[in-house]
Amino acid sequence: DLSALPTPQGNRGANIADMAAYNEKINPFKNGITPEAEAAWENRYLDFFKLFLKHKDKITRVTLWGVSDAGSWKNNFPVRGRTDYPLFFDRQYNPKKIVQLVIDEASK
């Protein structure tokens, strides 16, 4: 699962104060992803697709778990209200920059 968000780790426990800090830590982009985080996410995805293309003789398909960020199963997981940006199309179904980057890489 590729995500722009940090991966939750550790025991969250039952302390409400700890949970609030934890929720903020793993949901940093609830009002929109920063350009820096989006660029890092794009680079990570592109690195994976370069690897897939390098081994295209062994890989027959790549599955993405959804189309648009609006309907991603990663929203609200692992905590309610979490906003993720894991897919190739934004919440309005507009293609992200990664779509063209992958097309360009595959066309080489």
Annotate the PLM regions.
Residues L2-K108:
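Aromatic-rich peripheral "rim/lid" segments of glycoside hydrolase catalytic domains that contact
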